[in-house]
């Protein structure tokens, strides 16, 4: 999941997600993903009809519907409001717990580190610190 959404402008939200689901071996359920990211009401809209945060949630849905073993996220909640951020983080947490997806989140938001198993901090392109998180905070309880 990148900061640039790369949505296909001539496809609806649902079609943008289906493109990926159709080539995936074991995709997640479309309705579950749309509901979890609170974008089910936009399923027939085109990207140009969505806000930046809504477009970001569609891009996240495209990545998640594949049911990947590894999910790399660059500023996952960067364009999202607090409510949407929490929804996305709860769904990522569920993917990790329920489906065993390894999630790597690159972020400047220190609060998100609270839900991580391991926190790796970089400085000047080098690992400056690596910590195991002994007190994980559920996504629902993060102060974002």
Question: Which residues are covered by each model-predicted region?
Answer:
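Helical segment within the ABC ATPase nucleotide-binding domain
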Residues: 86-98
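Catalytic Walker B motif of ABC-type/P-loop ATPase nucleotide-binding domains
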Residues: 71-74
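Short coil-to-helix segment of the ABC ATPase nucleotide-binding domain corresponding to the Q-loop/switch region
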Residues: 11-18
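Conserved catalytic motifs of ABC-family nucleotide-binding domains
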Residues: 67
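Conserved ABC ATPase "signature" region
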Residues: 25-42
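Conserved ABC ATPase signature
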Residues: 46-50, 54-56
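Hydrophobic anchor residue at the start of the ABC signature
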Residues: 60
């Amino acid at each position: 999941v990148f900061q640039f959404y790369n949505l296909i402008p001539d496809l609806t939200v649902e079609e943008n997600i289906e493109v990926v689901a159709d080539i995936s071996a074991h995709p997640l359920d479309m309705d579950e993903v749309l509901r979890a990211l609170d974008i089910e009401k936009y399923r027939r809209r085109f990207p140009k009809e969505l806000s930046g945060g809504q477009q970001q949630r569609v891009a996240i849905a495209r990545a998640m519907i594949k049911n990947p073993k590894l999910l790399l996220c660059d500023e996952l909640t960067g364009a999202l409001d607090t409510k949407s951020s929490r929804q996305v983080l709860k769904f990522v947490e569920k993917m990790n717990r329920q489906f065993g997806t390894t999630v790597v989140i690159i972020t400047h938001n220190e609060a998100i580190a609270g839900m991580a198993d391991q926190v790796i901090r970089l400085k000047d392109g080098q690992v400056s610190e690596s910590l195991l998180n002994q007190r994980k905070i559920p996504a629902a309880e993060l102060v974002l």
